[in-house]
From Swiss-Prot:
Biased composition (Low complexity): 113-136
Motif VHIID, chain ranges: 427-431
Chain intervals for the UniProt region annotation (PFYRE): 519-614
Protein name listed in UniProt: Scarecrow-like protein 31
Compartments in which it is found: Nucleus
Domain GRAS residues, every copy: 306-693
Region (VHIID): 396-461
Any GO MF annotation of the entry: transcription cis-regulatory region binding
Keyword tRNA processing belongs to the record: no
PROSITE patterns per the UniProt record, alphabetical: GRAS (PS50985)
GO cellular component annotations of the record: nucleus
Keyword Cell inner membrane on entry: no
Gene for this chain: SCL31
Length: 695
């Protein structure tokens, strides 16, 4: 296409426009030869003609609001040939009037097959002196296209005053009037082509109800349009120009208000969800327990017995043999065993099938990802997903309804902290691994009633930085939510966020410990993620972490650990221990939750599946799941300078009564051993909690 266009188009003067094409997102190359700013003429393309010396720059918000329309127009310009279809520059009013004229010509004169060239009256002004052929020349539009049916007599003469179009290129040597009339009025075939062109052009345009963008359904309005003849419609449009702008402003304001209402409604639902899951009822019981699915465990057992038993598969033996083959480097045998496991396992089957599915994934990743690329890419894809607190809370609520583990861990920790701070005026809690802060709403609720003399609650939340440009975003959001709860219950609050990858390297001044405050250190189920000693290091990071807590000299130190022994350096031993541990967890869910529960599927995949992948497929510093038994941690803590507070037998008995009241499964185990509060499933201890003070 020629780069230099000059001439007259529809009465518009665009000499004031800039000489570069805006980037509309369709890859249109910039050019200084022509510029069609269609967004400036969207509201009234054939009504307002600016002065020649007027420089117009539309507001940025107006351009943004019509960005979708610009994309449609730009796509049309990219796909159509401007040299072959010159009428693309004409406005909709001229097109509509041309249609009416064609209908009248066809109906009045069937004998007249073409319009003589000499019956067309043209008048041009400034034919040669107003334009130049340079690449920086502007296009001056001085044409007025008017159709008045009363001028169409028997002769069918049409008058186009001042109508030289795009003159200046060699291929546009004839006046635009003659080209237009010959192509449109030559014979009846041209009429059919014209209608066919309309049908083709309509494919590029959106539906009628899509011209109002980003409006909610309740905000849509039906605007009646009355078609008038001649200049009356144009005059009415010009008269109501400001009224339409005011109406559009009202629509935009109403849309903003509706969005604010929607956001407030979502916040209200999210707050209600947090309250239901994290707060206590009038009897100091978790509200989520009442609506949980644990009460249906008996029905699930009966339903399972009623079904016809499927052929039993010994997944444990198959998985163990496959792990031994992987460890020995026997890829052929391992692949054969994996195929047998894949035929029977399923992420939505029973407990053993789900367990086999995730362990088979981990074994396959270890077998195929000898260089670590496949393993780490999978692990990063899971860990780097940005999961909102609401998404985690849904899965967390299912875990609470299925098992009492987290509820009793929080109850134990909160009671020990409240006992230590019963007369405190300022309580400072340092929470290692605060994450979303699910532990603290119920604590704040109870603190507001048990200690009316408390002047301030301070919480220092410590967490591993998340991926991205804002590593502290998650823990800052946690602080904001806790602030809202403190305002709600009337507890003065101060929050401090620390993001650190290696917790043993945090400086003492970062905790902002002040004199005359009760200091409580809390670490719930995060010891398993601490780095262990690796070859080449003299000091163990786990011992360094405990030494840091001892240097803080807390009034009370609460620790809850995952009781597992799959931190061994030997793969086969680690695999067997992990298989025993996660078999109990999957069996727990199978006995208390239905197979089709979507939150159960999400929780098993996002948490247990990721942990299994890390334990089995990763090695070295990439393996971050390294749990130890509670007796191993007891030795470490005593060596670090702590002494253990005894667990009251009355407290364990109270927890047993609570668990029976809440309707949990009878196979859950609560016990006390060596001043540790233990929880498990069917005799296997899974979690342990204890309270420590400096010796």
């Amino acid at each position: 296409m020629e780069s230099n266009y000059s001439g007259v188009v529809n009465g518009y003067d665009v000499s004031f426009l800039p000489t570069s094409i805006p980037d509309l997102g369709f890859g249109v190359p910039s050019s200084s030869d022509f510029d069609l700013r269609m967004d400036q003429y969207y509201h009234q393309p054939s009504i307002w003609v600016p002065d020649q010396d007027h420089h117009f720059s539309p507001p940025a918000d107006e351009i943004d609001s019509e960005n979708t329309l610009l994309k449609y127009v730009n796509q049309l310009l990219m796909e159509e040939s401007l040299a072959e279809k010159q009428s693309i520059f004409y406005d909709s009013l001229a097109l509509r009037q041309t249609e009416e004229m064609l209908q009248q010509v066809i109906s009045d004169s069937q004998t007249q097959s073409s319009i003589p060239n000499n019956s067309i009256t043209t008048s041009s002004s400034s034919n040669s002196g107003d334009y130049s052929n340079s690449s920086n020349s502007s296009v001056r539009i001085e044409n007025e296209v008017l159709f008045d049916n009363k001028h169409l007599g028997d002769s069918g003469v049409v008058s186009f005053p001042g109508s030289n179009m795009l003159r200046g290129g060699e291929q546009f040597g004839q006046p635009a009037n003659e080209i237009l009339v010959r192509s449109m009025f030559s014979d009846a075939e041209s009429v059919l082509q014209f209608k066919r062109g309309l049908e083709e052009a309509s494919k590029f345009l959106p539906n009628t109800d899509q011209w109002i963008f980003n409006l909610e359904p309740e905000m849509e309005r039906v605007v009646p349009v009355k078609v008038e003849e001649g200049w009356s419609a144009i005059s009415k449009t010009r008269k109501n120009h400001h009224e339409r702008e005011e109406e559009e402003d009202d629509l935009e304001e109403a849309r903003r208000r509706s969005k604010q209402f929607a956001v407030n409604e979502e916040d209200g639902k999210l707050t209600e969800m947090f309250d239901k899951v994290l707060l206590l009822d009038g009897e100091c019981d978790p509200q989520i327990i009442e609506d949980g699915e644990n009460g249906s465990s008996k029905a699930l057992v009966k339903k399972g017995r009623a079904k016809k038993k499927s052929r039993a598969v010994d997944f444990r033996t198959l998985l163990t043999l496959c792990a031994q083959s992987v460890s020995a480097g026997d890829k052929i045998t391992a692949d054969d065993l994996l195929r047998q496991i894949r035929k029977q396992c399923s992420p939505v089957g029973d407990a053993s099938q789900r367990l086999a599915h995730f362990f088979a994934n981990a074994l396959e990743a270890r077998l195929e990802g000898s260089t670590g690329t496949m393993i780490q890419s999978y692990y990063d894809s899971i860990s780097s997903k940005k999961r909102t607190a609401a998404q985690i809370l849904k899965s967390y609520s299912v875990f609470l309804s299925a098992s009492p583990f987290m509820t009793l861990i929080y109850f134990f920790s909160n009671k020990m902290i409240l006992d230590a701070a019963k007369d405190a005026s300022v309580l400072h809690i340092v929470d290692f691994g605060i994450l979303y802060g699910f532990q603290w709403p119920m604590f704040i609720q109870h603190l507001s009633k048990s200690n009316p003399g408390l002047r301030k609650l301070r919480i220092t939340g410590i967490e591993i930085p998340q991926h991205g440009l804002r590593p502290t975003e998650r823990i800052q959001d946690t602080g904001r939510r806790l602030t809202e709860y403190c305002k709600r219950f009337g507890v003065p609050f101060e929050y401090n966020a620390i993001a650190s990858k290696n917790w043993e390297t945090i400086k003492m001044e970062e905790f902002k410990i002040r004199p005359n405050e009760v200091l409580a250190v809390n670490a719930v189920l995060r010891f398993k993620n601490l780095r262990d000693v690796i070859p080449g290091e003299e000091d163990c990071p786990r011992d360094g972490f405990l030494k840091l807590i001892r240097d803080m000299n807390p009034n009370v130190f609460l620790s809850s650990t995952v009781n597992g022994s799959f931190n061994a350096p030997f793969f086969t031993t680690r695999f067997k221990e992990a298989l025993f541990h996660y078999s109990a967890l999957f069996d727990l869910f199978g006995a208390t939750l239905s197979k089709e529960n979507p939150e159960r599927i999400h929780f098993e995949g996002e948490f247990y599946g990721r942990e299994v992948m890390n334990v089995i497929a990763c090695e070295g510093v990439d393996r971050v799941e390294r749990p130890e038994t509670y007796k191993q941690w007891q030795v470490r803590m005593i060596r670090a300078g702590f002494k253990q507070k005894p667990v009251e037998a009355e407290l364990v008995q109270l927890f047993r009564e609570k668990m029976k009241k809440w309707g949990y499964h009878k196979d859950f185990v609560l016990d006390e051993d060596s001043n540790w509060f233990l929880q498990g499933w069917k005799g296997r201890i899974l979690f342990s909690s204890s309270c420590w003070v400096p010796s």
